Amino acid sequence: MENCTGIILAGGRSQRMGTDKGLLLLDGKSFVSHIYKALQPLFGENCIIVSSNPDYDFLGCTRVEDIIPNKGPLGGIYTGLKYSKTKMNIVVSVDAPLVTTELLQWMFSKHSELFLVSQLLVDGKTNPLVAVYDRSIRIQISEAIAGNKLKVRDLVDGVIHQDVQVPEKWKNQLVNINTPEEYQNLKR
């Protein structure tokens, strides 16, 4: 997909986990490696990772630091979109290591340019951190950050967006890993 960029959000402080989540191992590979593997067939080298951690440089994709630090995932999305050269962008948070190429490709196929965001919906809950973002939403994100309104869901709810119901077969891919307990359960 030449007209789209993959953006991996890996700049979080991982306070609940106590360590950098993207470097946690699952089946012998880091979380970030699993996500990159899912994105790579779709975008090749057209991938950005938002993180200040140089340990992510092994991936070989462009690593950028938050333009406006300490603004959470919204700041990471803003940074990724600012560095992106494409209109459409697939954003994936580093704490979702189970996403597959098939899910991301399907999600992108459901996106329409009528929407600024297409986010996934599982069991009535939206996931704006595995979503398609139109680069032009940078303006609204910049305004939200300036007003210190940092909740990604609030931003998405305030723009033209669509919620895409995830088929049953892919629901397990959207498990977020934020605590040591969740990580231990994932490894079982």
Q: Residue spans of the language-model regions?
A:
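Nucleotide and nucleotide-moiety/phosphate-recognizing core
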Residues: M1-K149, D157-K171, P180-E181, K187
